[in-house]
Amino acid sequence: MLVHSKSGRWAAWGLFGLLFLPLFALPLLVVVAASFATHWSGAFPSGPTTENYAAAVRGESLQALTTSLVTALAASLLALAVGTWAALAAATLRKRGKRFLDALFMLPVAVPSVVVGLAVLVAFSRPPVLLNGTSSIVILAHTILVTAFAHQSVSAAIVRLDPAYEQAAASLGARPGYVLWRVKLPLLLPSLTAAAGLCFALSMGELSATMMLYPPDWMPLPVRIFTATDRGSLYSGSAVAVVLMATTLLVLLAVSRVRTRASYR
């Protein structure tokens, strides 16, 4: 009731500004400001330049961006496939089985991602499945880390589905496979695209597990940012970070547009 009054709305906006600006907006604005600077003296950056961005979109930085895009795309598609399959399977299980499956998929989220990276490194550093030193081990680790979010998103969407559509299709003689591909999955499409976008964004920003696994020829952009700032190249690292943020945001906006179109079908 408080927010419906004029004073309540002003208080809500004031609280939002008080929390949003120092916690979210200002740190990002500082990174953007640093990306255009050559040095920082006093309270503000100085020496404005665009050379940091010129370096951020060529050479090793461009290769790292491509690596991140390929890794995130592959991991999000794999996570979406596995998470959707698990969510559909869990919907047919009893309560205890569903809880067990949910807990199994949430396990990688419950532990630090560096632990997941170590587990993948130990598990796949020897035959018969030797992935250490390849790009596949990075994609696998990212898939493990983001599958839980795909599983939870699709599971929540399945619970909200009206069973009348499936029942109507089945009563007309449609086979289970046809009902799945032509009825159920199209109804889940908005949730599937949202889950894919979330998995993509999480994969694009993953660092801890990646640091333990990436080979020299498969360095994702977050690792590139870390190594740049670790060497003292704070301003060029900030430019690369802005490129990472912008790329992820553009992909999320595209996914949101696809989801909106799917919702109106």
What are these regions (language model features)?
Residues 85, 175, 217:
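Gly/Ser/Thr-rich beta-alpha loop segments that engage phosphate groups in nucleotides
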Residues 168-169, 179, 183, 225:
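Hydrophobic positions on the alpha-helical face of helix-turn-helix-like DNA-binding modules
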Residues 8-41, 54-159, 183, 187, ...:
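Membrane-water interface segments at the C-terminal ends of transmembrane alpha-helices
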Residues 1-2, 258-265:
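Short cytosolic juxtamembrane segments of multi-pass membrane proteins
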